[in-house]
């Protein structure tokens, strides 16, 4: 019986070895998937560390505005001519032209092993409102509350504002207070004091203000002008331009970048003026991203996805050497080889956090190849 079994094994040794190698490859998918989960866990810890730093410095910033709001009232009259059913509404107007220029000063901060890009920026805003068109709101029984007019500027994270803001309208300084009366920026931003728009306005109403802002990674804008012009510059060498609009002109060099956008009201999906209803500006946001050029966890995650392929190819090479050269490889040796390949990804993950992905890949490769050869 034993002799018959030995003959069967010898006669089908290649097929049996192929089956063993196949099942070993399947089994080694388990540690490979565990390593992939470990990479995901480290990536989550990185995100937590980044969020912690951002929460104390300032998160990604999106700037909306300025938006001019002029309240008005509609009412009915009773038989004696007294006002009844008085309802207050708000009419919103966007500027005809807005120009924004600014420079971004990035800095890389570190928490444990994790890095995040923070920035400070000084932005200069100027633009104009032409004579406003009230035909859309003027009714028989309507009173425009021009003395209660105000401007709102949305800033997604007010913790990043570094200096008090003075809003200048037709050379009249208007003080600002934190918070917006409207929900176009989820209430985050600042609002000017009330002013008399009819008294203080002219044929061309100019505005200007400066904004010193801190944030992290991303700086975006909403194109509120009938014509929106933005110019940004920075010494960051690896910017990524994202959002609804790419720059019309950009220059990226070893010393930084300069980018220019020119956007028309036809390019977006909201009007120049409206009444009461809220508008969704988020789909029109655009700007620049200052993330680090190398995300080692993404690279490591991509590498681990090919772990099963590397294991299978390595086993195939040894199998064909065994068949063609009559060089016997014990199943335990296949197990050790597969384990060494799994250790490669652990080395890659741990070393890349210290010395960078490229050097870590080289060191891990040399180490594993040495283990297999020896």
Language-model segment annotations:
Residues 1-10:
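N-terminal Lys/Arg-rich, disordered targeting/topogenic segments
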Residues 15-20, 110-117, 194-199, 299-309:
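Membrane-entry segments of alpha-helical transmembrane domains in multi-pass membrane proteins
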Residues 17-33:
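Hydrophobic membrane-insertion alpha-helices, especially the h-region
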Residues 34-60:
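Alpha-helical transmembrane signal-anchor/signal-peptide segments
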Residues 44, 48, 55, 65, ...:
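Soluble non-transmembrane domains of integral membrane proteins
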Residues 75-87, 364-374:
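Alpha-helical membrane-embedding segments
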Residues 281-282, 286-374:
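Transmembrane alpha-helical segments that form the functional core of multipass membrane systems
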